[in-house]
Swiss-Prot record:
Keyword terms of this UniProt record: Repressor, Stress response, Transcription, Transcription regulation
Name of the protein described by the UniProt record: Heat-inducible transcription repressor HrcA
Record HAMAP family: HrcA
Pfam families: HrcA
Single Gene Ontology BP annotation: negative regulation of DNA-templated transcription
Role, per record: Negative regulator of class I heat shock genes (grpE-dnaK-dnaJ and groELS operons). Prevents heat-shock induction of these operons.
GO molecular function, one term: DNA binding
Gene from which the chain derives: hrcA
Family assignment from sequence similarity: Belongs to the HrcA family.
Annotated PANTHER family: HEAT-INDUCIBLE TRANSCRIPTION REPRESSOR HRCA (PTHR34824:SF1)
Domain of life of the organism encoding this protein: Bacteria
Length: 339
């Protein structure tokens, strides 16, 4: 059990270390934080906190820094969310583009850029595989006498365009009719569910236009090639160098290699819809043991769709970053609600 005085001292150490990046000594806490106890008492309490695993001592310093366990206690029990400025609140409201006018992936990329700018951290987006998305519509548009543009829209707002070749392109009215029938037969199916039975039924419904059906479906599969796994993209990778923790060339190289390994990054990020904070030893990827990862899910309508995460060192301003993340995700999910 940790008593109130130890909690006060631990909070002061963490706040000071987040602010300065320098190991913290008992005299610093006594002078700056007016806790009503002597430097000697603080020193003894710090020794106890170290024995309990909440503090650790860097090899080259007499001061102490928070451990992963210390940060976890701080986030779970001591943190107070920082109030955002009116400028920050306005930027959040105005930067996430209108969900009725833009595709979901554009909105998500805009949001990741905003998060990266406001937090000065690297933003990671983990989007689902298109293969696991449902067909929303398929539209066929004439390009020339033997070419048709096929536009696939999925339920999560992903759009894929591909041009198919046919013997002869029907008139516009017929293309609209064909598009409508294909959409009716394929709507709410995943790409993986479009099997031989579905194709046979579609050919019967479009008797005389089998060449179009037989060109459309392979083209869709081809355009989605490589999308079998979750899509991961980054925003603000260079922000990692804002932190002195990565001034060391070895650490910088290690974190950059991790960020460019999409499989490892995908495994790092929680799929939970709720806001999740992982700190240091809680992350089961060796290269990220000195990192913190804050993630939250986003939705299209009622469907959980993907995850947005921020990655940085353990020493980040949790109260500010969590405030920003909370407001941005609230605005994003409100924007996507009616997609």
């Amino acid at each position: 059990m940790i008593d109130d005085r130890k909690l006060q001292i631990l909070r002061a150490i963490i706040q000071d270390y987040i602010s300065t990046g320098e190991p913290v000594g008992s005299r610093t806490i006594a002078k700056k934080y007016n806790l009503g106890v002597s430097s000697a008492t603080i020193r003894n309490e710090m020794a106890d906190l170290e024995d309990m695993g909440f503090l650790e001592q860097p090899h080259t310093s007499a001061g102490r820094i928070p451990s992963s366990r210390g940060y976890r206690l701080y986030v779970d029990r001591m943190i107070e969310f920082e109030r955002l400025s009116s400028e920050e609140e306005g930027l959040i409201r105005n930067s996430i583009i209108d969900g009725t006018l833009y595709e979901v992936d554009k909105i998500i990329k805009q949001t990741s850029a905003l998060l990266s700018e406001l937090t000065k951290m690297t933003c990671i987006v983990k989007a689902p595989s298109v293969h696991k998305s449902f067909v929303k519509s398929i539209q066929l548009l004439k390009v020339d006498d033997v070419s048709i543009l096929c536009v696939l829209v999925t339920d999560n707002g992903v759009i894929r365009n591909t041009v198919i070749k046919v013997k002869s392109v029907p008139i516009s009215e017929e293309l609209i009719k064909i598009s409508k029938i294909i959409t009716e037969r394929l709507k709410n199916l995943t790409i993986e569910q479009i099997n031989l039975e579905v194709i046979s039924n579609l050919n019967r419904a479009l008797n005389g236009y089998e060449d179009i059906v037989n060109a459309v479906l392979p083209a869709l599969y081809e355009s989605l090639k490589g999308d079998e796994t979750s899509e991961v993209f980054l925003e603000g990778t260079i922000n990692i160098f804002n932190y002195p923790e990565y001034n060391n060339i070895h650490k910088a190289k290690e974190i950059l290699e991790l960020l460019h390994d999409k499989k490892s990054i995908s495994e790092l990020i929680s799929d939970s819809d709720d806001m999740t904070v992982k700190i240091g030893d809680e992350i089961f990827v060796p290269e990220a043991k000195e990192c913190s990862i804050i993630s939250a899910g986003y939705h299209v309508g009622d469907r959980s769709l993907g995850t947005i995460a921020l990655i940085g060192p353990r020493r980040i301003n949790y109260s500010k970053v969590l405030s920003i993340m909370t407001e941005v995700m609230k605005e994003l999910n409100e924007t996507l609600k009616n997609k």
